[in-house]
Each structure stands twice: as structure tokens, then as C-alpha cells.
């Protein structure tokens, strides 16, 4: 088993054990979102790290450095806006994610070109890719 595969498996296990970092009192008030904010209150149980409160973000929860930030498939996630940017990708180490601002017509062109070059597109389902390729 290669070191890379071992680290990817370790990353997955660590992710499963990692707690969900939520903003303090986000379950009590609808106006407060769940996105993490560091608690700053003087008597805040979460800030003091009382056992029964939610866990705060700590450096020990990070994943292995070599595979940090990679897609679960092990490929580097690159945002693509046009076909030119797609040509610059390496299909063995990088995958494409089509930017949200890209319209349907250009999205179809990108998916077709990615299929020709053998590049994986992360945010287009296999079913949708089949529809795009048949057009």
C-alpha cells in the first residue's frame, strides 16, 4: 500500500471522528448561523472548553499535510471558467470543478472537452455528463 493511499484512508477516518464545529447558541436562535465563530464571552462555557459543550476548532483536528485540501478521489480540485483553463490541467493529478458563474452553453463545451482530455469534472453528475455529451 502506497503512502498516499494510506494517508487518504487516514484522512477519511479523521474526518469521520472530527466533531461538527458549530457556532455557540446556533441551535437556540434562528438568526445565528451554524458557521464557526470563536466564542468570546466572559462566561462562555464553549470558550473555557467545558466538557459537555461543543468542541472548539483546534489545530489537532487537521488532516495529514500531504493530502490536505485534496478531493476524496485524491485529485487536486481546480476551478475552471473556460475551455482554455481546462487544457492546462494534468488528468493524473488534477480534476476540474466548473465555476458557478459559467452558463449552460459553456458548461456543455467544458464537459465535452474534459471528456476528450480524460479530465474528471467533480460538480457535474455522470447522468448530466451523459446528457451533455449527447447534445
Swiss-Prot record:
Entry's Gene Ontology cellular component terms: cytosolic large ribosomal subunit
Superkingdom, natural source: Archaea
Keyword terms, alphabetized: Ribonucleoprotein, Ribosomal protein
GO molecular function, one term: structural constituent of ribosome
GO biological process, one term: translation
InterPro entries found in the cross-reference section: Ribosomal_eL32 (IPR001515), Ribosomal_eL32_arc (IPR023654), Ribosomal_eL32_CS (IPR018263), Ribosomal_eL32_sf (IPR036351)
PANTHER family for this protein: 60S RIBOSOMAL PROTEIN L32 AND DNA-DIRECTED RNA POLYMERASE II, SUBUNIT N (PTHR23413), RIBOSOMAL PROTEIN L32 (PTHR23413:SF1)
Family label: Belongs to the eukaryotic ribosomal protein eL32 family.
Name of protein: Large ribosomal subunit protein eL32
